[in-house]
């Protein structure tokens, strides 16, 4: 969340920046500021009452020493009344603080000053392209290829679990395992530490990264108030919640392979076939925790690390900088990697890399001590490195020759050095 004191001190600028997103945040900002005024007023009143109580308590002690018990008892009655007032004010303070926190949890991060301004993905800006968009004689959708090669059972998933679930079979299951291994090896070779994370997290972890309360309807919650992770970002980023890190520990680079779970609320009718939009999917995640000065450079490096995956498989892609209206709730700046799908004749997102600045760190209280000994909020970054189901879909469409699937060079060692699957 944002710092309410920063909001108050930069009210016009904050409103101006946030309203560049697809929405008007002026009202909720004003409500948060008003609640903070109330909070500070209550705190001041409590402080004055406690000061008065301390003075009266000293008088009671003096009177008792002088054996003026009647006067002392009168003052004790005043102290009792003050205690009652403080108790009521504490209750009011708790309520106001809860209301303020609720408002702040629904205010997104401030977009970076240098981001393109726009309303939606139509206003995103292409930064660069890599590779050649393939124009093929045999443009076949990836789900037909997967079905023909018996890589995915698209009927078993719905039979077992409902729509938007799939079952990888035989070489398809081997493909998932092989790709996760290749991606983790690639990222660990670049200095990321591999982590295996729980698939269930507590609500505090979801609040920490900003999934709650904004995206509650998109999450799977269990009967004991735990959440299935929507992304490996949640457990990885929360590993250092509540900690003060030494400067020499930064930057921290983590990677994990996990299954992820999303309700895909609001996606009815979109990508109903294939592997693009699933309730349960496979992903390799990248997370960085940095000092405040280096996060922008670390974001660019993270984008390059995600690009390395697509280059390894020689898949055409483009890098797109998201506009203010399309950037995610917790992000200050985001780049999407979009891979080429010949059958659809367009690029589709396969990775999203974001700098969340201190937005998540404030929720989690992830801090570090700088060179001068000052404690500061860390910056957090996250990115897909990459979404494996979408990577499989892209490989199928780009490497299908009409009769068989030509295996990319990086995959051949995992398939007994075969040239293709048919």
Swiss-Prot record:
Quick one: which residues bind L-serine?
231-233, 285, 384
Q: Name one GO biological process term.
A: seryl-tRNA aminoacylation
The superkingdom of the source organism is Bacteria
Q: What is its EC number?
A: 6.1.1.11
**PROSITE patterns this protein is in?**
AA_TRNA_LIGASE_II (PS50862)
The compartments listed are: Cytoplasm
Pathway connected to this protein: Aminoacyl-tRNA biosynthesis; selenocysteinyl-tRNA(Sec) biosynthesis; L-seryl-tRNA(Sec) from L-serine and tRNA(Sec): step 1/1
Q: Name one GO cellular component term.
A: cytoplasm
Renumbered to this chain, the signal peptide range is: none
Q: Where does ATP bind?
A: 262-264, 349-352
Its recorded reaction(s) are: tRNA(Ser) + L-serine + ATP = L-seryl-tRNA(Ser) + AMP + diphosphate + H(+); tRNA(Sec) + L-serine + ATP = L-seryl-tRNA(Sec) + AMP + diphosphate + H(+)
Q: Which NCBIfam families match?
A: serS
What's noted about domains in the record? Consists of two distinct domains, a catalytic core and a N-terminal extension that is involved in tRNA binding.
Say what the protein does. Catalyzes the attachment of serine to tRNA(Ser). Is also able to aminoacylate tRNA(Sec) with serine, to form the misacylated tRNA L-seryl-tRNA(Sec), which will be further converted into selenocysteinyl-tRNA(Sec).
Give the protein name, as stated in the record: Serine--tRNA ligase
């Amino acid at each position: 969340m944002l710092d309410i004191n920063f909001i108050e001190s930069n009210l016009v600028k904050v409103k101006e920046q946030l309203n560049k997103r697809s929405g008007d945040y002026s009202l909720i900002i004003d409500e948060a500021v008003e609640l903070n005024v109330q909070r500070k007023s209550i705190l001041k009143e409590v402080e004055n009452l406690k000061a008065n109580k301390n003075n009266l308590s000293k008088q009671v002690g003096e009177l008792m020493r002088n054996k003026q018990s009647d006067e002392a008892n009168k003052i004790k009655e005043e102290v009792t009344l003050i205690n009652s007032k403080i108790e009521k004010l504490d209750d009011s303070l708790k309520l106001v603080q809860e209301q303020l926190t609720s408002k702040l949890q629904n205010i997104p991060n401030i977009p970076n000053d240098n981001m393109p301004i726009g309303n939606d993905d139509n206003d995103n800006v292409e930064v660069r392209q890599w590779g050649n968009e393939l124009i093929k004689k045999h443009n076949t959708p990836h789900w037909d290829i997967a079905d023909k090669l018996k890589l995915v059972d698209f009927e078993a998933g719905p039979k077992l679990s409902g729509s938007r679930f799939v079952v990888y079979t035989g070489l398809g299951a081997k493909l998932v395992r092989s790709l996760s291994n290749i991606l983790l090896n690639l990222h660990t070779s670049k200095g990321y530490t591999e982590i295996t994370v729980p698939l269930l997290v507590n609500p505090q972890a979801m609040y920490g990264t900003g999934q709650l309360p904004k995206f509650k309807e998109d999450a799977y919650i269990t009967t004991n108030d735990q959440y299935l992770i929507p992304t490996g970002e949640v457990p990885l980023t929360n590993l250092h919640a509540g900690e003060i890190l030494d400067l020499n520990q930064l930057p921290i680079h983590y990677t994990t392979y996990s299954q992820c779970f999303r309700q895909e609320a609001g996606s009815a009718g979109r990508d109903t076939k294939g592997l693009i939009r699933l309730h349960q999917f496979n992903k390799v995640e990248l997370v960085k925790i940095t000092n405040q000065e280096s996060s922008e450079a670390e974001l660019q490096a993270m984008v390059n690390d995600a690009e390395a995956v697509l280059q390894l498989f020689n898949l055409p892609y483009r890098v797109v900088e998201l506009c203010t209206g399309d950037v995610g709730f917790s992000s200050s700046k985001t780049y999407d990697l979009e891979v080429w799908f010949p059958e659809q004749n367009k690029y589709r997102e396969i990775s999203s890399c974001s700098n969340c600045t201190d937005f998540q760190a404030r929720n989690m209280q992830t801090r570090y001590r700088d060179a001068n000994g000052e404690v500061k909020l860390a910056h957090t970054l996250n990115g897909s490195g990459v979404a494996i189901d979408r990577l499989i879909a892209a490989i199928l469409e780009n490497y299908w020759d009409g009769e068989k699937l030509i295996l990319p060079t990086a995959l051949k060692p995992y398939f007994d050095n075969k040239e293709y699957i048919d």
